[in-house]
Amino acid sequence: MTGPTRYLSSRDRAAFTPVHAVWEITLACDLKCHHCGSRAGKRRPDELTTEECLDLVRQLARMGTREITLIGGEAYLRRDWLEIIREIREQGMDCTMQSGGLNLTDERIKAAADAGLQALGISIDGLRDVHDRLRGVKGSFDAAFKALDAIKRHGLSSTVNTQITALVIPQLRELMNLFIEAGAKSWQVQLTVAMGRAADNPELLLQPYELLELMPLLAELYEEGADRGFLLQPGNNIGYYGPYESVWRGNGDDRVYWTSCNAGQNTLGIEADGTIKGCPSLSTSKYAGGNIRDLSFEEIWWTTDELNINRGRTSEELWGFCGSCYYADVCKAGCTWTTSVLFGRAGNNPYCHHRALELSKQGLRERITQVEQAPGTPFDHGRFELILENADGTPRAKLPLANNLIQISSPRRKTKRTSARKELVLCRGCYRHVMPGTKICPFCQGNIRALANRYAKNLREAKKAYQRLVELLPPHIETFQ
């Protein structure tokens, strides 16, 4: 592999190799986060033993897993966490970890590095007041940055994760500057989702129309970060198909774009009691495929319906706006986790930039409102209603939770539905993706071929100009390649 081990090859995709596992090794946690989907705090009553954990590591290795990310709760609160790290590395897999950092001491970080841990991510969800409020412990912000400093000193790669709530949007630029100063190399952002304690605090959730503010800001920060050697990475529930998809999805490779939820295709989640899911964030009640105490990992991966939810998924399963969307056959409604916890079923995703843009063009927007509380168990969710209203917030029409097809003047896709992957083309006029064979862009009305030719010509001229500059400069002046 020339890139990070979790990067997928065409062979990985075709073979459904479980490349990346995210493993909650304990539910015990020293924070009290208001947006925690798993409601972490106390350990699960029947967490895997050390030997069961080590055996699962070996099973994952045999199935072709290349990276395991340890999470909690807090992974370091499990007494044998270092032993698990060592076994992962001995089995030839990469080992990374995500933490809130509250009690991630210098000694713990050094021990993890000595055991073979390669990268350590710290979750920081706002500036000091916002972060400490969300994390439920005063001083957690300072502890997180202290951990970042120790990670750097011990030679581990450091990353930061941020849950985007309604509170943090105005703070994102300042946060990025702080992360860069702290030595972090990358920053993953994802939308806070209505699961667990976040479902108890719906005021933290973004409204779908707020993507119109968020997405341009993230695009600006991506470009600013890239200029400073810092990578902003959108999580899998940040999207989809607006004018910025080509900017960040492929980390600079504009041929890369969202191609549907990967849960159970090349990723999986493991709960501390041995429950296996296609994604660590999916609700246990609906998406648990089985437990390694009852079945081998290989059996769970290949034979359970819950792990196969996305392998043969077609656009026939979509509904609402997503059911008639231009990108339905490719996108398949984005993140399964985000949609299933809102409405109790996947397939209609209001957190979509393309969707927000299309509605905005008609003076409309969508808003969610909670109609059913979450029961209070790990990875639980309530139920939300989707309301279509005028862009100024005045009433327009109320959508029921089923059969709420939104008819808009969005460009229509072909009527034939298929699960085969389409290779989309990037319009060089508006930088939105279009279907192969499209002659006139349905979004900007530009001529796709003419725009591509003009772009290629400009690129050739820019390269020639750069080469002339290199030839004219004195030899002692450095140039950037």
Indicate residue ranges for each PLM-predicted region.
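Accessory C-terminal segments flanking Radical SAM cores
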Residues: 237-359
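Short cysteine-rich clusters marking metal-coordination/redox-active sites
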Residues: 33, 322, 427, 441-444
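Conserved alpha-helical substructure of the radical SAM core
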Residues: 1-119
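Short functional micro-motifs and their immediate structural scaffolds
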Residues: 34, 41, 330, 340, ...
